[in-house]
Regions:
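A contiguous, well-ordered beta/alpha segment that forms the leading edge of an enzyme domain
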Residues: 1-109
Protein backbone atom coordinates (compact mmCIF):
# COMPACT_ATOMS: atom_id res chain seq x y z
CA UNK A 1 0.00 0.00 0.00
CA UNK A 2 1.22 3.49 -0.85
CA UNK A 3 -0.01 6.87 0.34
CA UNK A 4 1.19 10.24 -0.93
CA UNK A 5 0.19 13.52 0.68
CA UNK A 6 1.17 17.11 -0.06
CA UNK A 7 1.52 19.23 3.07
CA UNK A 8 1.74 23.01 2.97
CA UNK A 9 4.03 24.05 5.81
CA UNK A 10 7.20 26.06 6.47
CA UNK A 11 6.34 28.32 3.54
CA UNK A 12 6.71 25.43 1.10
CA UNK A 13 5.12 22.12 0.17
CA UNK A 14 6.40 18.89 1.69
CA UNK A 15 5.62 15.57 0.02
CA UNK A 16 4.96 12.65 2.33
CA UNK A 17 5.32 9.44 0.34
CA UNK A 18 4.66 6.43 2.55
CA UNK A 19 4.73 2.80 1.47
CA UNK A 20 4.04 -0.23 3.62
CA UNK A 21 3.42 -3.89 3.00
CA UNK A 22 2.71 -4.55 6.66
CA UNK A 23 0.15 -1.87 7.55
CA UNK A 24 -3.47 -1.71 6.54
CA UNK A 25 -4.88 1.49 5.05
CA UNK A 26 -6.20 2.82 8.37
CA UNK A 27 -2.82 2.36 10.09
CA UNK A 28 -0.91 3.92 7.20
CA UNK A 29 -3.25 6.94 7.09
CA UNK A 30 -2.87 7.30 10.87
CA UNK A 31 0.94 7.21 10.59
CA UNK A 32 0.93 9.84 7.84
CA UNK A 33 -1.47 11.98 9.92
CA UNK A 34 1.06 11.87 12.78
CA UNK A 35 3.91 12.93 10.48
CA UNK A 36 1.79 15.78 9.11
CA UNK A 37 0.92 16.96 12.64
CA UNK A 38 4.62 16.84 13.58
CA UNK A 39 5.40 19.13 10.62
CA UNK A 40 2.67 21.55 11.73
CA UNK A 41 4.01 21.53 15.30
CA UNK A 42 7.53 22.26 14.02
CA UNK A 43 6.08 25.23 12.13
CA UNK A 44 4.22 26.46 15.24
CA UNK A 45 7.34 26.17 17.43
CA UNK A 46 10.12 27.27 15.06
CA UNK A 47 8.63 29.82 12.65
CA UNK A 48 10.29 33.23 12.73
CA UNK A 49 7.19 34.57 10.94
CA UNK A 50 4.70 33.61 13.65
CA UNK A 51 4.80 36.02 16.56
CA UNK A 52 3.62 33.37 19.04
CA UNK A 53 6.17 30.69 18.08
CA UNK A 54 8.72 29.68 20.67
CA UNK A 55 11.56 30.84 18.45
CA UNK A 56 9.94 34.27 18.06
CA UNK A 57 9.50 34.49 21.82
CA UNK A 58 13.16 33.47 22.33
CA UNK A 59 14.25 36.12 19.82
CA UNK A 60 12.34 38.80 21.73
CA UNK A 61 13.67 37.62 25.09
CA UNK A 62 10.17 36.67 26.30
CA UNK A 63 11.23 33.16 27.25
CA UNK A 64 14.41 31.33 28.15
CA UNK A 65 15.61 28.22 26.36
CA UNK A 66 15.11 26.24 29.58
CA UNK A 67 11.36 26.96 29.30
CA UNK A 68 11.07 25.82 25.68
CA UNK A 69 9.84 22.43 24.52
CA UNK A 70 12.24 19.51 24.38
CA UNK A 71 12.42 19.78 20.57
CA UNK A 72 13.33 23.47 20.68
CA UNK A 73 16.00 22.74 23.29
CA UNK A 74 17.38 19.92 21.12
CA UNK A 75 17.61 22.18 18.08
CA UNK A 76 19.22 24.94 20.17
CA UNK A 77 21.88 22.44 21.31
CA UNK A 78 22.41 21.21 17.73
CA UNK A 79 22.83 24.83 16.60
CA UNK A 80 25.46 25.38 19.30
CA UNK A 81 27.26 22.24 18.13
CA UNK A 82 27.05 23.24 14.46
CA UNK A 83 28.41 26.69 15.31
CA UNK A 84 31.39 25.11 17.10
CA UNK A 85 31.93 22.50 14.38
CA UNK A 86 31.97 25.14 11.62
CA UNK A 87 34.07 27.57 13.67
CA UNK A 88 31.22 30.07 13.48
CA UNK A 89 30.47 29.75 9.75
CA UNK A 90 27.01 28.51 10.78
CA UNK A 91 25.70 30.81 13.50
CA UNK A 92 21.94 31.18 13.92
CA UNK A 93 22.49 33.84 16.60
CA UNK A 94 24.00 36.22 14.02
CA UNK A 95 20.77 36.34 12.01
CA UNK A 96 18.98 39.65 11.77
CA UNK A 97 16.49 39.71 14.62
CA UNK A 98 18.33 37.10 16.67
CA UNK A 99 18.26 33.33 16.89
CA UNK A 100 17.05 31.81 13.59
CA UNK A 101 17.54 28.03 13.38
CA UNK A 102 15.67 27.72 10.05
CA UNK A 103 18.76 26.49 8.21
CA UNK A 104 19.04 23.54 10.57
CA UNK A 105 15.37 22.88 11.39
CA UNK A 106 14.18 21.91 7.92
CA UNK A 107 16.82 19.20 7.70
CA UNK A 108 16.29 18.14 11.31
CA UNK A 109 12.52 17.78 10.98
Amino acid sequence: MRLERLVETWGTVVVIDATSSGLDEVALVSAVDEVEEFFFQVDRDFSTYKSDSQVSRLRRGEMKIEDATEYVQQVWALCEYARELTLGAFDPWKAEGGFDPSGLVKGWA
